A protein has these predicted regions:
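Surface-exposed, charge/polar-rich loops and edge strands
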Residues: 2-42, 46-180
């Protein structure tokens, strides 16, 4: 069985799209997945299931969450090997060591073009640094995320796709859960 990590977009953030993690775990169990675990209350799941392409699994989870839980949101799924590569390919290792909370990985529905990445970089007005790698973007927020004008909305607009972000601490915790 393949280990998968699923991230939900914008749940339990600022009172939007409230969901109880136990309900999500139960949903995945009802769908036939095993060893379903969650991390934090922001929609992070680790589970085992038969090998499927990430996009097929995302579609299944989105449809079933909408139908059974009335939860309309995006799911972003990576398998454990892909997750290891995300950790290994971090272009900002020094920044991660210095302040892991100020490094995020934004998971994207579609891979941005080089032109879109350059458009985002050109739109940055602060000290933020962006590096895109396939379906992920690594973003360093030296002055903190809360004060930055580089918002998820701006990233999505410039990349022309939806995404969800997790800080480096959460990325590493999910990597550890996927190894257990």
């Amino acid at each position: 069985m393949t280990i998968h990590i699923a991230l939900l977009r914008a749940v339990n953030v600022g009172g939007r799209k409230p969901i109880i993690m136990a309900e999500l775990r139960d949903l995945l169990t009802e769908l036939g997945f095993v060893d379903v675990r969650s991390l934090l209350q922001t929609g992070n799941l680790v589970f085992r299931g038969n090998a499927r392409r990430g996009i097929d699994l995302e579609r299944l989870l989105e449809e079933e969450a909408a139908k059974r839980l009335d939860l309309h949101t995006d799911f972003f799924v990576r398998n454990a090997e892909e997750w290891k590569a995300i950790v290994a390919n971090n272009p900002f290792r020094e920044e991660a060591k210095r302040d892991a909370a100020h490094l995020i990985v934004m998971f994207l529905k579609c891979t941005p073009s080089a032109k879109d990445v350059e458009a985002l970089r050109a739109a940055i007005t602060g000290p933020e640094i962006v590096s895109a790698d396939g379906g992920q973007a690594y973003i360093v927020y030296p002055a903190g995320i809360g004060r930055s004008r580089l918002t998820n909305t701006l990233v999505e607009k410039k990349f022309r796709t939806r995404g969800t972000a997790r800080n480096w601490n959460t990325i590493l915790k999910l990597a550890s859960l996927a190894e257990d």
